[in-house]
Amino acid sequence: MTLQEIFAGCTAKPLLAEEPMAKHTSFRIGGPADLMAMPQSEQELQQLLQRACEAKVPVTLIGNGSNLLVRDKGIRGLVIKLGNMLNDVAVDGCTLTFGSGVSLAAASRKAAELGLSGMEFAVGIPGSIGGAVYMNAGAYDGEMAKVVTSVRVMELDGTISELPAVALDFGYRHTALQGSGKIVTAVTVRLTAGDKQAIADKMADFSNRRITKQPLELPSAGSMFKRPPGYFAGTLIDQTGLKGYTVGGAQVSEKHAGFVVNIGGATAADVLQLICDVQDKVFAAHGVHLEPEVLVLGEE
């Protein structure tokens, strides 16, 4: 039985066979997914997961693909893209609950519209709020750990539960969700009442800084490396003379050395080789090991 036949009875449509993952990542890189589904509700997600569990089909979950590198041979089994799902928002005073598919930037703007402070840092971060919790995304001294109070999660067998923030074990670009098999379907944050103009001004400042300093004009997966203790990854890479360093179609950004950009036709192999080269050269020059921040999926 083919994958399309296994999932034919599911209400999530369309089911995309041999779907190029390059179309679904901000890097514009990645081989094909055997089958991709984009559920629009918890019920559709539950149905897909239960069918996959019964048929023993491997499942890979992605959000909006903004912090992701997919290898050139693609991903086997079923890929479920959650970025279009669960875009609802519920407001209860200073507490907001977002469906996991809400973009982080949209969540930040919604909070600002309500005069609530705490999510200004998120205005320019790409991706969904569900993915942002998974990776504990952050910028400008803000991070998801500072505002999240609980998450709603679904297990790979379709069961649903609520987890308090303390159960997520937040760390730098880390949560207990990583590798757990739990799928975030909703995120609850608690913010503080603030001055709308002051919030808007702070968001405008953060947006302008990103436009000025980051290579937003080229495909990338955001910051490539985690910040090593006591250092900035981009500064170390720049000091090693690697701005503009190129492997195939992948390049250390000439605008910000903490970013690897796709200058045209880059493959995952190009990016992975560039990462290794940068790690080796920075370690040789500074004795500091750079750890990638970007999630790597798929077959080599």
Residue ranges of each PLM-predicted region?
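Generic structural motif
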Residues: 15, 87-91, 148-151, 250-252
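Short, basic and Ser/Thr-rich N-terminal targeting/leader segments
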Residues: 55, 62-64, 147, 218-219, ...
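A generic local secondary-structure boundary/capping motif
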Residues: 67-68, 108-111, 119-123, 136-143, ...
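Anion-binding (especially nucleotide phosphate/pyrophosphate-binding) glycine-rich loop
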Residues: 2-129
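Short, well-ordered alpha-helical segments in soluble proteins
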Residues: 111, 129, 133-137, 152-155, ...
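Phosphate/pyrophosphate- and phosphate-bearing ligand-binding catalytic cores of soluble enzymes
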Residues: 16-17, 68, 154-281, 285-300
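Structural signature of FAD isoalloxazine-binding scaffolds in flavoprotein oxidoreductases
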Residues: 30-31, 37-42, 69-87, 134-165, ...
